[in-house]
Amino acid sequence: MKTFTAKPETVKRDWYVVDATGKTLGRLATELARRLRGKHKAEYTPHVDTGDYIIVLNAEKVAVTGNKREDKMYYHHTGHIGGIKEATFEEMIARRPERVIEIAVKGMLPKGPLGRAMYRKLKVYAGNEHNHAAQQPQVLDI
């Protein structure tokens, strides 16, 4: 018996839509990363992108436990000397709520070209509307 290896051209990708309202950030992100990698499929192959497309709605309503709403910090650097910037979870949700979920999921994906290809299949929206109706996404309950 031979080991099965998925071919990139034969992988069937589905579209799913997830509502993030009231979901805990980390628990949601782990399931999204798992599905973006394709680990839920029988034909999962580590070196091939076998994951599905995922649309996340209501990113502004994602929940965190404990004091993370005030205490969790996000950092980025502008590239200039002394250009480190920081923002709390509350500030990130107010300014760009999509980035909170994107950052959490991106950290759970592989680093390198394969991980970037997986990350591109994640579509996050702050509100309840998305422009992927033509793909006929299925509702995914996480």
Curated annotation (Swiss-Prot):
GO terms for molecular function: mRNA binding; structural constituent of ribosome. Keywords: Ribonucleoprotein, Ribosomal protein. It comes from the Bacteria. InterPro entries: Ribosomal_uL13, Ribosomal_uL13_bac-type, Ribosomal_uL13_CS, Ribosomal_uL13_sf. One of its GO terms (cellular component) is cytosolic large ribosomal subunit. Gene3D superfamilies: Ribosomal protein L13 (3.90.1180.10). GO terms for biological process: negative regulation of translation; translation. Belongs to the universal ribosomal protein uL13 family. PANTHER family: LARGE RIBOSOMAL SUBUNIT PROTEIN UL13M (PTHR11545:SF2), RIBOSOMAL PROTEIN L13 (PTHR11545). This protein is one of the early assembly proteins of the 50S ribosomal subunit, although it is not seen to bind rRNA by itself. It is important during the early stages of 50S assembly. Part of the 50S ribosomal subunit. This is Large ribosomal subunit protein uL13.
